[in-house]
Amino acid sequence: GGETGSDAKAMWFGPRL
């Protein structure tokens, strides 16, 4: 996963595109 994202999950899930 990436550190870029609006959601908190995006931190470990990756950028939500």
Swiss-Prot record:
GO terms for biological process: neuropeptide signaling pathway. This is Pyrokinin-5. It is found in: Secreted. Expressed in abdominal perisympathetic organs and abdominal ganglia. The lineage of its organism: Eukaryota, Metazoa, Ecdysozoa, Arthropoda, Hexapoda. The modification Leucine amide is found at L17. Coiled coil: none annotated. InterPro entries: Pyrokinin_CS. GO terms for molecular function: neuropeptide hormone activity.
